[in-house]
Amino acid sequence: MVVSLVMGWTLFCTTGCWDRVEIDERGFVVGVGIDIPDEQEQGAAEEGNGFAERDYLVTYQLVVPSRLKRAGSSGSSDQSYFNITLRGDTLSSLTAKLSSKTSRSPFFEHLQVVIVSDQVARREGAFSDIMDYFVREKEMRRSLSVMVSNGKAKDILNIKPPNEEMPTKFIHSAAQNTQESSRMLEVSRLGKVHASLLKRDSFLIQLISITKEHNIFINGSALFDGRSNRFIGFLDGEDTAGTNYIRDLVKGGVINAKLNGQLVAYGIERVKRKMHAQITGEKQVTFYIDIHTMGTLEQIYKQMDITKKKIILTLEDRIDQDIARITNHVVKILQQDYGRDVLELGAYLSQEHYAQWEKIKDNWEEGENLFSKSKIIIKVNSIVKRTGNVIESEKD
């Protein structure tokens, strides 16, 4: 009896990992791009499946660990990744189909980036359905990045950036460089995007595109309507910077100001925003936003005497004017062109003026659209902490 128990336990232990897949046999999915099939791709529908309203063209970027090691060694021509593009009407069916298209078992726990094309994001219900799929899948992480592409997502995943082993790795790293540029939106995490969808708040998502030089470019943002959860327009880099200042999300960047026709580069080191609101009657809301910046003159000219306080004060005033121009411009666009509050002013009222907010929230973006009618007064105060490089200008 004892011998039988020992043999049974031994057999159990030795077969405990019968379904294990070796790491070198896995196909790690690190990037996903979602498009609408174009006319040429529609004609190549698989197995007689005609074009449907919800057809997707999905590109999966997979990395092979064994090739990743060899690709890093000198003289190796092995590519550490490969792309597979499939077409279907649901993401779940395409995930199942992916397993039959590669000899390696697809593994999604290391998925870093999901790129949704602007055409897909315009479809009614499409974007929310896609986000819901990724949230519900057990292998997906809520920290993965979500981006919208201006153009085909497939084309972006097919570009191999210089000095990087794979496109997704470059995209994942570059998307986090907000400390270098105020024109980039903060990384749009799946969890936060899904929360905005549930709350039916209008929101922004990082924008990615391809330049004329065929390089990957992360700049600007995609604007989504909170009621329909559909993409409704782009904000360029400067307007995105304006939203970052108002939302207190600027971590760095450069402001180019002019003094006497000469360009001065002001490197931002710290930004602090203060805000308060005043509600008159039941419907008139006024926001007072103070933006304080501190930074360095990174590029100046030798003939400009920066030891004089008057020169520094004039430069600070020019910087104030530039930031005020950027922020007021995006406020005008959001209020007059879109009528959508992606500045999170409604969220501020909900926290700081809850009773009044409950009375006006249904008319904030809809109905009377009180967001568009609210007053937003912005004041900027910039300080030059120290000077940087001096460049001697040409003398006549």
PLM features: residue spans?
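Membrane-proximal alpha-helical signals and transmembrane carboxylates
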Residues: 2-396
